Structures are given as structure tokens and as C-alpha cells.
Amino acid sequence: MLLAVLALTSCGTGNSLAKAEREAEVSRNVQQSLDNRHYTIAVDWMRPLGGMARHVTSNYELTVNGDEVDSYLPYVGEAYRLPYGGGKGLNFKGKINNYSITYPTSNRSHIEFNVTNNEDSYSFRIDVFNNGKAVIDIIGRDRDAISFDGEMIFKS
């Protein structure tokens, strides 16, 4: 009986160690990606200003590569000025301006930058947690704000 208890206890400890190692590896990958300014966040929820949160079913994502951003995100909300035909919304590539990163807590990184294209000017605020979870807030000059929840993905 004592042997069975010891065996079960040691299995639980092994699983805890493996989980802690995985969490530490994810945290290192997050930090390395942010330090290199090369990361992708896949979104699974959007929260329009004044609207209901909605699950996103397609492969929407935001990618930062150095001084450029590739935004492939859905947009639901009010737009105040649009080009003829409706425009591209939040589907664009652009040059990043005023990129900054701060660490308000030990498990959260806060990123801010601006992007201007021929349709609008956008302010991005991104919170990335050590577990890879992320919240993206986007404020457009000519559009209602929108937020997204997602997770950083690591490509092998």
C-alpha cells in the first residue's frame, strides 16, 4: 500500500515538474520574441466598442516583424470616414512608428505603437503575458476602438 502511494506521489511530482518546465519554456519564447520584435498573435475573440464579444472562427492574426506590422484582423464597429468601396479595415501592412515596450508587472509586457496608412491612423496597445496570452486594443482616428484576445504563436 505504501509503495502505491509513493508511486502515485512521484508521478504527480513528475507531472508538476514537466508542466513548470513547459511554462518556463513558453515564457522564454515570449520574451525572446518580444526582444527580437518578431512575433505573431493569433486572435480568437473580438470585442467591439459597445458591442458583444464574438468568437472569431477564421485564422486572424497580427504579426510584428521589426519595424513593420501585418494586420489581418476583422473589424466590427462604426467608421466615420471610409474610402469608396468600404476600404480594407484592419487588413493591411504598414510601417511601425513610436514602438515602445514596458513591463508593468513581472508576468506582463505592454507594447504600444502607431501605424498610419492611406485610410486611417491606428494606435495599437498590446498586453502579452508570460503564458503567451495577449490582449490587443486598436484605436483608429476614424473608427470605433476594438479589442482582441488571442495567443502568441511560435513557429518552429
Model-derived features with residue positions:
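Sec-dependent signal peptide recognition
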Residues: 1-2
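C-terminal motif of bacterial Sec signal peptides marking the signal peptidase cleavage site
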Residues: 7-10
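Bacterial signal peptide processing site
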Residues: 12-15
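N-terminal secretory signal peptides
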Residues: 20-83
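A generic structural signal for short beta-strands and their flanking turns/coil linkers
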Residues: 37-39, 58-60, 65-67, 88, ...
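Short, solvent-exposed secondary-structure boundary motifs
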Residues: 47-56, 87-93, 112-119
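A low-complexity, Ser/Thr/Gly/Pro-enriched, surface-exposed linker/loop concept
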Residues: 78-100
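Helix-rich interaction surfaces within compact, conserved domain-sized segments
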Residues: 94-156
